[in-house]
């Protein structure tokens, strides 16, 4: 199964949007393999966003993601899951995100864009390993409704 890491950022948690956002992924048929509320510390934030180090927005991003609790989740599905998740999340800038996407429906500002999602299957695996220990994940568990979602 292909996996993507999701981070419901501090603005999503503070605005009480956890349930509304999580339910979209469930309703789409994706399986949650891990889900937790946590406070990201500076070291973890820098590790996760290492590819952006040196960019003008990096320090602000670290400060923001560590400012309040976040919800971190791993969703899994058939090949193409990461692309599907990215489509559901919408454009980085909520002002340019299509209606029907998470950012298009709930977002207002690029600096408070609600959610992070892995941008490739490789990133999904790398990011999952940053936030979850293997024992915290439930692998390929069976749901009775899977036959109604996947051929």
From Swiss-Prot:
It catalyses: a 2'-deoxyribonucleoside 5'-diphosphate + ATP = a 2'-deoxyribonucleoside 5'-triphosphate + ADP; a ribonucleoside 5'-diphosphate + ATP = a ribonucleoside 5'-triphosphate + ADP. Keywords: ATP-binding, Cytoplasm, Kinase, Magnesium, Metal-binding, Nucleotide metabolism, Nucleotide-binding, Phosphoprotein, Transferase. ATP binds at residues 9, 57, 86, 92, 103, 113. The keyword ATP-binding applies. GO terms for biological process: CTP biosynthetic process; GTP biosynthetic process; UTP biosynthetic process. Its cofactor is Mg(2+). Its EC number is 2.7.4.6. The active site is at 116 (pros-phosphohistidine intermediate). PROSITE patterns: NDPK, NDPK_LIKE. The keyword Chloroplast does not apply. GO terms for molecular function: ATP binding; metal ion binding; nucleoside diphosphate kinase activity. GO terms for cellular component: cytoplasm. Its main location: cytoplasm. It is an enzyme of class 2 (transferase). Homotetramer. Belongs to the NDK family. HAMAP family: NDP_kinase. Major role in the synthesis of nucleoside triphosphates other than ATP. The ATP gamma phosphate is transferred to the NDP beta phosphate via a ping-pong mechanism, using a phosphorylated active-site intermediate. This is Nucleoside diphosphate kinase. The lineage of its organism: Bacteria, Bacillati, Chloroflexota, Chloroflexia, Chloroflexales.
